[in-house]
Structure formats: structure tokens, C-alpha cells
């Protein structure tokens, strides 16, 4: 296979993150790869908490446990890793959430093709200069070196052999394994090839990893060649975006930078003017918000266990870093809106689930803010008193009472040169779990024992709720706090059993009814009980609720009234669920079977066995079918028959469900026929409307559709109509004109922005030219160190770069100033060094950091360019004096 080689002066492409993603996938699709969508962050692998690598969804294939229909696939996989969470924001490239582009071969092509295509993609598609690429290989992989050197034509001095720790992949102590080869981008090839240190992240960044699975390792450690070799590759999207967009770090790419701009707008600052410490908090917020949005979108809820704890830890880290930069009010949803907007084209399910995501963010943020201030005060007190260690008991109190993840306490302690006694923390945690387990067992067993006992004494409840929503009944049993009682009073949370009831008890996926139970008390005042749930226990219906008024006594006659609105909503959702299963069988696959369901008052959820996502076109077809059946006004036929008769007439049963000899069959004539004990509408027209909200995968071979019906659709439409009305008022336009107005406004903003940037650049370049006569010449070099106030961060960077370009390779330029003369708390410093200055041992990033500290800030960057911020303009002249002193000492 011939590989076209570009000349060393080829132009590197400037591509957006979306364009990079599409270019990668299309490149491999053109070479016979099936494009597969990203798997969920919640993996179908009990050994792994979260999806941490692009290859993880294909792990069963690589291990030989599962066949893959296609021998070649390519994907962009969303991933989360938290093992380096403390480095997020502090380095240029660490993230918790990232996207991994990959191409995979399952026993098809191997090393030569993988290397050739990786090079072709890097050079021909992305336009990387070959002289900027360094290759690493496993120390014993002569085959890979021969391909890189002789087939591709890479300079042997830019092929680096590495040991097993760095360049040999394995799935575990035994199993498939093999060498890998990595492509690094060299930001400074002018520094030569004498001492290439790939761990120098100011010069090199790994952007593509090729794993050659060619061996199997047995229990004795012996390697044998695999009959079918596999390829597993990974290219970090954020890293490639940094390279192609020519920015200092991953966070300044178009994938993340809009998040930083949004954060800056919340506290009315310019991101580029900030010091390194504050920028680090911005990056933590931006990165973690991306992770949280995707975790919630994939069904994870904040909790103290497993994935839920990862989400909670990330969310609370975001809130804390928000406080560090001056944000005291809830703000997560505002950042999440931008995150969803940035990622919705690649992950449309985020848009579908945005309200769910926002609700979870609001819930968790509000919960943490309620205790954060008190927790911070306690922590501040601990920090001031602790000589070197925060005790485990104190850390546990912060965790248990104030919601501080212990990792967050560790992080804050480290910032103050302290540590947390983790052994003591774990001891306190274990003790609390022991107490909680004991208490929970006592309460749960006591309540369940009591319920079981009273049910066995009073017998089954006669359910009349199919025919009526009101019914007189008699109290057979009262349970208060797990104890069987003769009566209950105002404020008691109770469970009561009646001899008959119109309340539907939770079952068959349908939620139990809610409503009111009332009676005349002994003092003739009305007893009123709000029922919030009803469940079935051995044929008895247990009604749970709160006594709002009066006294209820065992044996009292009561009036039961089901909340008719809630019941109608549940009925509409339940019948809609039956229609949904019928539509799936008709529009997608007749072999689809139910895996589970939830029928709530405001929504429905249907889980089904299916191997792939349901397409957008199929979902649209399903909606049309269901709304068509609704408008056709089918009258339901509900009947009881023997299980054998039900099977004979073709009624669908839930696999694994136990049925009696007599079953209830719900028939929507010509559409659906199912065994079901739930409540339903009498005619499909009562449903009104049906709308699918989301379709996702929840496990291997199981998909989930969430939808709304009836009133839920009206609420959904009203919410959207409200948004349209607000936009109409803001734009002073009719609803059908809004899209055109938004497009026109965006075009106008772009045009004005270009004019503003052009004007700023013109001013900057004019000032730059006037500074050239202030250059100071030394023996073999020259420098310019000046103050330049009233110039924006972007403009001052442009000035510095222009001056270095014009002055030449032996020039060092450092400019600093207040970008806004009305703001006495902002300073920006920028340095740029020519190649000869770097060769003399100066590094712009390392040089500028200590200078910025004088102004109360910090910063850094690459050897040839760096920027920093500060908060004290009064010290700026002192900082520039130190810069001159150090330049002269180093160069003269």
C-alpha cells in the first residue's frame, strides 16, 4: 500500500472539533470500517465502573467471548476517568471526560495497514508536518520499526524504543496482549533529535496510540502468537483539536473554551486576563460539567455509591470551585446548557434528556449548597487548628453531616499542606455502616413482620377500582411506625388495610393510586388521611399516607376517594405503553419483547430486548402510528379468561411473569392484545396525544424508551410554547420569524466581532511598531520589555508574536499591562522567545511564572510563548524590572 508523503512545509489543517471527529470516522469508513455510535458511559461489564477507554465496548470481542458482525469498526467513544482528577485544571491535557476516536480490526488487517493508515490520516487528512511527528515503539518490536522506517519513511532518529511499562498492552495477567506504537506531536522540532524526552509535555503530546494484539499470555507468563491478530487504536479528540487549532492547551479548543467564556461571563471577567490559579478553577468547572452532563444523560443519579458517588464528587467539586472564583448562587444549569449545545450534534440524546439533566443538577447543587457554608466554616476551623493532620472523625463529620466527599476534604487539606487520616475516616465509615445496617434491618423487618402479620389476620382486600373511584370501606388494620395500633393521630405516617378499596395497588409496572381516605372521628370532626402510595402484600392492599386531621380508629367506616386526575394520567400512560409495544413490533421488529416498564402519573418507560438503537426515522414512525391509533378512537375490550384461552387468542404475556389460571386480557382491537392487571382508558381517544422523549440503551441488548401521553404532552407543549413566546417578545417577531431573526442576529454578531477584532489588531500593531525602537541589544541577542496598558489580552498576544517575528530568532519580548484602565485588579503578562533564546536555556513558561507572582498571580506556557495574569497592578513595574534583570543575567 503506497502512502503519499507530504513535504515538510505542508500546511496543517485548522479544523473544528466536529470536523476532526467527522474526518476521522469518514476516513476509516472509506476503508471498510463500520461506524458505530458511542456506547453508554455505564458499561455492560461488572468489572468496570465506567467506560474508561474507546475499546471497552469491544472488550468481549477482543477476549473472544462475543462475535462482531463487522471485522472493521470505527467509533468516537465518550469516556470518563477520575484517577488523575487532582491534575484537572493544573495541566494542559488532563480531563475527567474526553472523547476517544478509534479504529478497530477483529482478525482482519494488522500492523502494516494500521500504521500506514494512521500516518496517512495524520499527514494527508489533518495536514500534520512529518518533521513534527515522533514515533514510540515497544523495545522488541522490530517489525513496527521496519514499517515506520522503510515503508513510511520516518527518520530513525525520531523512532524511540520504550519499555514494557509504556508500550506493551495487556488485558490482565493472562489473555490477549501485544506491543503498541504511539504518535507524538513535537511542538519544537527545532530543538533537535539528540535528547528526545517524550515525557516533556511542554514539547511533546501523544495523539494516537496503536495497539497490536498479537499474543496470548498464559498463567506462567509465556507468550504465544494469536491465530487472529487484532488492532485497537485511540486518538484523543481534545488533543488533536489542540494541535490543529494551535492553542496552548485542550481547554482553549472550541470543544471546551465556550464553557470557560460562559463561566467568565457569570463573574464579569475576561478569561485571558486571569491568573493560573483562577484559570484552573475555570477548567475544573468546564471539564467536570461535561462529565456530569453525560453521566446524568446516561442514567446515573448522584448518590454515595458507585457511579452515583463519582457523579456526586464531580458535582460538588464544581460547586466548590465556583465558590473559589466568587460564584455563590446556583449556576450549574447555565454551564450545562452550553455543554449540551456544544455536544448535541454528536450526542443528540443530550438534547432529548436536557430537562432530566437540569433537574438532577439543580437537585444536587441545591442539596450541597444547603450545607456547604456550615461545612466550610467547620473545615476552616479544622485547618486553623490541625498541626498536620485532619482526623478521620472530623473528615467523616464533613462527609456525613455536610456532604463533603472525602476526596474533596483531602484536596483542600493538601492545598493547606495538611493530610487526612484516611484510616480513621474508614473506621468511622465502617462503624456508621454497621449501625445503619442494624437499624435498617430492625425497622424494615419490624414493619414487614407487622404488615405480614396483620395481612394474615385480616385477609385479602376486595379491589373495586376497575369500576369506580369512590367506595365506602372499613378499617381492618392500622400500622404506625412498624407497630400495629388501635388508632392513629394527626401527623402520624401510617399504613392501613381496608376490607375493600378503589385504590389501585402498585403492580404490573403501574404506580399505585393516590387520594384521600376520610371518616367521622369520635368528636364528630372529620378524619382526613392523604394517601401517597398503595402496594399489594399477599392479596391485601396496604395504603400508606399521612394523617392530616382527626383521629382514625380500628373498625371505623371510611370514605375512599381516588385522585381522579392522577388515575386518568396513569390510565393514559398505561394504555399508551401497550400501543408503544405494538408500534415497536410493527415499525421496527416483530420479535421485540418487553423487558420491563414503568407507568407513572406524568410519564411512561418501556424497556425492551433489542440489539441496536432505534433510529430517528423509526421513532418518528412509531409516534405517527400511536397518535394515529389514538385519533382512530379504538374502544378497549377488557375481559377475563383462562390462561390457555388467552394464549389461544394471541395475547402477549410478559416473559418470566407468573400468572394464575384466570387472567385479565386488555384488547385494543386490531392493534394490541396483552395480559394486564393495570388500569386503562376505555377508548384510545382519551389518551389525547403521545410523544417520545428519549431512546437509550441501558444494558447489553436492552433499549429503553421514555415517553409522555395526555396531560404530559400538553405540559411539554406549553413549556415549549412559553419559550417561543419569550423569544417572540425579545425579538419582536412572530413565532415563524424567530429562526430567521436568530440567524440574522448571529450573522450580525459575527460581523461586528470581526470589525472589533480588526480594530483592536490595528491599534495593537500600531503600538507594536512604535515599541521597536526601544529594543535593547546585547552581545548575541536583543530584548524588549515594556509596559502596554489599555490593550486587550488577545491584542497584546498579537503584539508580542509580531515583534518576535520581526526582530528574529535572537529576540526576547515581554509585554505587560492593565487591559482595562478602569479595573485596578487585573494584570496581563505575555512573553515570547525566539529559537536562539530557547537554545540558550530560557523557557518562556518557566520564566514568566515567577514574574507574575510579584503581581499576585501566576501562569505558564511553552518554551517559545507564555502568558500569565495578576491582581496587583501597583507591582507591575517591579515585575518588569525583575524580568529585565533575569534576561540580562541569562543572555549577556
UniProtKB/Swiss-Prot annotation:
Pfam assignment, any one = tRNA-synt_2c
The residues that hold Zn(2+) are 574, 578, 676, 680
Carries keyword tRNA-binding? yes
What EC number(s) does its UniProt record assign?
6.1.1.7
Q: What class of enzyme is it?
A: ligase
User: Could you give one GO CC term from the UniProt record?
Assistant: cytosol
GO biological-process terms attached to the record: alanyl-tRNA aminoacylation
Q: Keyword Nuclease on this protein?
A: no
Q: Where in the cell is it found?
A: Cytoplasm
Q: Which CDD domains match?
A: AlaRS_core (cd00673)
User: Which InterPro entries does this entry report, sorted A to Z?
Assistant: aa-tRNA-synth_II/BPL/LPL, Ala-tRNA-lgiase_IIc, Ala-tRNA-ligase_IIc_anticod-bd, Ala-tRNA-synth_IIc_core, Ala-tRNA-synth_IIc_N, Ala-tRNA_ligase, Ala_tRNA_ligase_euk/bac, DHHA1_dom
Q: Which UniProt keywords apply?
A: Aminoacyl-tRNA synthetase, ATP-binding, Cytoplasm, Ligase, Metal-binding, Nucleotide-binding, Protein biosynthesis, RNA-binding, tRNA-binding, Zinc
Q: Which residues form a coiled coil?
A: none
**Protein task:** Catalyzes the attachment of alanine to tRNA(Ala) in a two-step reaction: alanine is first activated by ATP to form Ala-AMP and then transferred to the acceptor end of tRNA(Ala). Also edits incorrectly charged Ser-tRNA(Ala) and Gly-tRNA(Ala) via its editing domain.
| Domain comment, as recorded | Consists of three domains; the N-terminal catalytic domain, the editing domain and the C-terminal C-Ala domain. The editing domain removes incorrectly charged amino acids, while the C-Ala domain, along with tRNA(Ala), serves as a bridge to cooperatively bring together the editing and aminoacylation centers thus stimulating deacylation of misacylated tRNAs.
From the Swiss-Prot or TrEMBL record, give the protein name.
Alanine--tRNA ligase
Q: Which organism is it from?
A: Prochlorococcus marinus (strain SARG / CCMP1375 / SS120)
